[in-house]
Amino acid sequence: MRFVVYFSGFVFALFFVISCINSRKNSSIDNNTFVKVTDGRIIGTYHGDLPCIDCDAIATVLTLSGDKAYKLDYIYVGKNPEPFTRIGTWNLDNGELKLDGLDYKYKVEPNQLRQLDLSGNEIKGDLADRYVLRFTNE
């Protein structure tokens, strides 16, 4: 009878020790990779040169403020030097930034915003990497 009790205790202790070992492959993943996007993390200024059909590029500056207001400046490089400005409010939902008055959204990524197409999907193709606004906080 003692043998059964000792053996059961040994098996229990063995399982306890084995369960404490973390052998998962994702245990070394950087914690910042999966940080929940919050309003405070995206406040600042973003710059980028978006593709343009009939001009060299669309120089874009997007400023997001803490009171949920945004200012978006476009300059059509090589066409019209006057900036086109849009002001409104912004909303963050499930990692996507929606600017009031615009039909498209931005996907929030570390230190950048990636413009999505009108259906809310990532833009694909040769110019996909140019639909990015990078955080500069000027």
PLM regions with names:
Residues 88-90:
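Extracellular/luminal ectodomains and secreted, surface-exposed scaffolds of diverse proteins
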Residues 93-97:
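Short, conserved beta-turn/loop elements at beta-strand boundaries and strand-helix junctions
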